[in-house]
Amino acid sequence: MISFWLIFLWLFVVLVLLFVVSLLYKTFSRKEKKLTFLSLPDEIVLNCLARISRSYYPKLSLVCKTFRTLLISNELTVARVQLKTYESFFHVCLKFPDKPNPSMFTLWIKPGQILTNQLEKNERSTGATRLVQIPSSYCSIVPHYLISVGSEVYGLSQHNDPSSNMFVRNKEDLFWCNAPNMTVARAKAIGHAYNGKLYVMGGCRDDESVNWGEVFDPKTQTWEALPDPGSELRFSSIRKIDVFQEKLYVSSNEKIDSVYDPKEGKWNVAEKSPVQCMNLGCGMIEIANYGGKLLILWDKVGLSQDKDIWCAVIALEKRDGVDEVWGKIEWASIVLTVPSSYVFLYSLLNRI
């Protein structure tokens, strides 16, 4: 009988010791919980992200799903507006022979880098300035094609998938609203405002060529088809639309430009100038206003029959007593190397 109680007591002591050892093991082996960036409240994370250059956003979106969600949220846009951390971004759309859909690139400039004029030094790019493709995981930042009509801004989707959607917002507002849909779905359409109306062209399928171009009237909120410009323009790649002498000039990658007269409702053709013809081969691609400075994009035959796309930013100055504008090259470098058969489609400048 005594041996039974001794055994029972021995087992009890063993169990108690095992319990104590287990408790001590859990206590000492448990790692101290570290405070991570993502453990902070979203408001603080958004405030931090809003102070970072958007140049880092595409790479940050690859870190984790939480970052990706925050980076494409409207709350981040609101935070940037409140902090006034606006940035101007230059985008280009290129078409490559081995890809079915056009690719969107944005000009990336490494923050804190001293940029130089590599034209003078005849050097290759240091990588401080590049045209970086917008990754599919970050496709929500693919910019709208923006057209201002009066106090409103209209946006056309620049995604590869055709869409008839159009968006509108007041210039003082942050968020987009749905506008009346276009009559056909378009992929990367081009638009321009003239006489209080919005003209949209291109980006539709061959069987929808009747509505290749259409005009939107904000007053009546209705769309109206434009006359057929002819197969040469319909099957070409449109670069941009300009207004000159009350007519719309449609620039393409062909040897001629098309001109539309809204008053007569007729299309005509116009020969390209020698400068414009340089766009068809090796030469100037685009000129844009980049934050009050002149941005020039051009290509040049590089190694292995590829082409190097160069970019230069020029600061302009009008000197006293001289009726001339002087320019100083702030920096120039190769920003992208592409196949020689690539096609430049268009450029966009966003301030976000």
Swiss-Prot record:
Gene3D superfamilies: Kelch-type beta propeller (2.120.10.80). It comes from the Eukaryota. The keyword Repeat applies. InterPro entries: F-box-like_dom_sf, F-box/kelch-repeat_ARATH, F-box_dom, Kelch-typ_b-propeller. This is Putative F-box/kelch-repeat protein At5g28180. The keyword Repeat applies. Pfam families: F-box, Kelch_FKB95. Kelch repeats lie at residues 145-196, 197-243, 245-287. Residues 34-81 form the F-box domain. Keywords: Kelch repeat, Repeat.
